[in-house]
Design a protein with these regions (language model features):
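Surface-exposed, low-hydrophobicity beta-strand/loop segments enriched in small/polar/acidic residues
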Residues: 1-128
């Protein structure tokens, strides 16, 4: 007789190998290749704060892929804004044809602030 546990990994966190040197990866979005996500494109998730220091290619990154977390804003955003990846893997308000990675759960009044976000991966924002 066989006994099976859960075969679905319901963790919000995965480990991704860094695909490049990243000076301060914490709270930045990364792609599946372990590199800082490209503006407007899909991101696998957001690097957690255990990775505050510089990482080199091949190092482990703890990446949050769902639920509520923190993301560094690349510009001012409002509570409830759909968020996409901006320059340097930071959160910006999603525009047409950019991939919606999350929803802002608090506002950022300037670039560099860390804000709470709901990671949703809602697909590409349609043109209005």
């Amino acid at each position: 007789m066989s006994y099976y546990g859960t075969v679905i990994n319901d963790s919000a966190i995965i480990v991704v190998k860094a695909g490049e040197e990243i000076p301060a990866p914490a709270f930045l979005a990364v792609g599946a290749d372990g590199k800082v996500a490209t503006a407007g494109k899909n991101a696998i998730g957001i690097v957690l704060p255990g990775c505050d220091d510089k990482v080199t290619a091949g190092d482990d990154l703890d990446v949050q892929i769902k639920d509520i977390g923190a993301w560094t804003a690349g510009a001012a955003v409002a509570y409830g804004d759909e968020l996409a990846v901006g320059a340097g893997g930071k959160a910006v308000k999603a525009t047409a044809k950019s991939f919606i990675v999350g929803i802002a759960l608090e506002e950022a009044t300037k670039a560099g602030q860390r804000i709470a976000v709901q990671i949703v991966k809602a697909g590409y924002k349609p043109a209005e």
